[in-house]
From Swiss-Prot:
InterPro entries assigned to the protein according to its UniProt record, in alphabetical order: UppP
Similarity-based family: Belongs to the UppP family.
EC numbers for this chain: 3.6.1.27
NCBIfam families named among the record's database cross-references: PRK00281.1-2 (NF001389), PRK00281.1-4 (NF001390), undec_PP_bacA (TIGR00753)
Keyword annotations of the record: Antibiotic resistance, Cell inner membrane, Cell membrane, Cell shape, Cell wall biogenesis/degradation, Hydrolase, Membrane, Peptidoglycan synthesis, Transmembrane, Transmembrane helix
Functional description taken from the UniProt entry: Catalyzes the dephosphorylation of undecaprenyl diphosphate (UPP). Confers resistance to bacitracin.
Tree of life domain: Bacteria
Membrane topology type: Multi-pass membrane protein
Transmembrane segments: 4-24, 41-61, 79-99, 108-128, 143-163, 184-204, 220-240, 243-263
Name this polypeptide is given: Undecaprenyl-diphosphatase
Organism: Sphingopyxis alaskensis (strain DSM 13593 / LMG 18877 / RB2256)
Length: 266
């Protein structure tokens, strides 16, 4: 597909950005445009390597997931509520994604869409941070069913590249009165079924055009993304707890504005 350095660089970008509200897909699209990373398998690569970051969540929160699994065997109410909220939150993305997949893939080739979404999303994050003051939900287990459904519906907006899946779900959670750290963690957990489904669907759809080299590139990019995300996922929660989401909003505005200038100049 492309040289090893490019594949590793894209894996690093994915690992750094998947759980930040800055759009990992948007960064991959812009980076691919700058690096000339194109070809029939490139779109599948950009989706599939996100699985590496998702595996990092399973490792980083392995004790939490193990506890939930054991709790389900005992029909523990907290474990049941946790699982219910994740599955309910995943449902809207599964339904909309199945219908809108081809349209989303077309948008994946538009750096201009990414730049605008980054810019607008940054402004939205700043506005929501100022608006939200009341905390009603302090854990995933305590989240009402309607809140999980609403956050899942908001996640569908992130099918537009540059919006950010984590950004959409976290901001949606904040608007529903979810505490910051809980909002971030729910976004992580919700990513597991969402991105596993997206990766499996993308690889299945592109199975006829993916070569052995493409699959090797995906494996390398996925592994690099996993290693980097393993560090980022815990650090992000600590940063949010101390500084909130404003730093990421300003970053989006700068990158989105810079990308628009670059595209206009190019």
């Amino acid at each position: 597909m492309h040289d090893l350095a490019t594949i590793i660089l894209l894996g690093i970008i994915e690992g750094l950005t998947e759980f930040l509200p800055v759009s990992s897909t948007g960064h991959l699209i812009l980076a691919s445009e700058m690096l000339g990373f194109t070809g029939e398998g490139s779109a599948a690569f950009k989706i599939a390597i996100q699985l590496g970051a998702i595996l990092a969540v399973l490792v980083a929160y392995r004790a939490r997931f193990w506890g939930v699994g054991m709790g389900l065997l005992r029909a523990d109410p907290a474990a049941v509520a946790f699982t219910r909220n994740i599955l309910i939150g995943f449902l809207p993305a599964m339904l909309v994604g199945a219908v809108a997949y081809e349209g989303v893939r077309a948008l994946l080739e538009s750096p201009a869409t990414v730049a605008v979404a980054l810019l607008v999303g940054g402004i939205a994050i700043l506005a929501i941070e100022r608006m939200v003051k009341v905390v009603k939900v302090e854990s995933v287990e305590a989240m009402p069913l309607r809140t999980a459904i609403a956050i899942g519906a908001v996640q569908c907006i992130a099918m537009i590249p540059g919006v950010s899946r984590s950004g959409a779900t976290i901001m949606g959670a904040l608007l529903m009165g979810v505490e910051r750290r809980t909002a971030a963690e729910f976004s992580f957990f919700l990513a597991v079924p969402t991105m596993m489904g997206a990766t499996a669907y993308s690889l299945w759809k592109d199975r006829a055009i993916l070569t052995f080299d493409d699959m090797n590139a995906i494996a390398i990019g996925l592994f690099v993304a996993f290693l980097v995300a393993l560090v980022v996922v815990k650090a992000f929660v600590a940063i949010v707890g101390r500084f909130g989401f404003a730093p990421f909003a300003w970053y989006r505005i700068i990158v989105g504005g810079g990308a628009l200038l670059w595209l206009a100049w190019k």
